[in-house]
């Protein structure tokens, strides 16, 4: 092999290696920023079609209804813990260390985004509450399916305390 062919081979090898490195870094970056949506039942039992459960440490979004009577606040900090359930009966505990949205109440639909820290526990970095009584996030509405009924709030729930 002459010198010219060796240079071409080295250049082609470096080019292919560089493209492979860039592609792998790009896929890694996209994968780490991917937030998959799960219902509480899917977190506990796995997806219906595939049986795939989210892994501990994975960034996910979970949507459902805040279980009435499940909210526990730490009086000395912003830390709050509450349960989110769906129509199929699955329940996930969500912990959050920031201010909750003004529209957050027990018995209403929410979407929480964060990291799964245990099989049924999510450490949320963001909590989104529905806008009004008629609105429900599309993922939650689809996950709740036909069994979602309009909720009747008592005076205490409407006041937010």
Curated annotation (Swiss-Prot):
It holds the Pfam family CcmE. It is found in: Cell inner membrane. The chain crosses the membrane at residues 9-29. One of its GO terms (biological process) is cytochrome complex assembly. Residues 30-161 are periplasmic. Residues 1-8 are cytoplasmic. Coiled coil: none annotated. GO terms for molecular function: heme binding; metal ion binding. Heme chaperone required for the biogenesis of c-type cytochromes. Transiently binds heme delivered by CcmC and transfers the heme to apo-cytochromes in a process facilitated by CcmF and CcmH. NCBIfam families: PRK13165.1, PRK13254.1-3. Belongs to the CcmE/CycJ family. This is Cytochrome c-type biogenesis protein CcmE. It comes from Shewanella woodyi (strain ATCC 51908 / MS32).
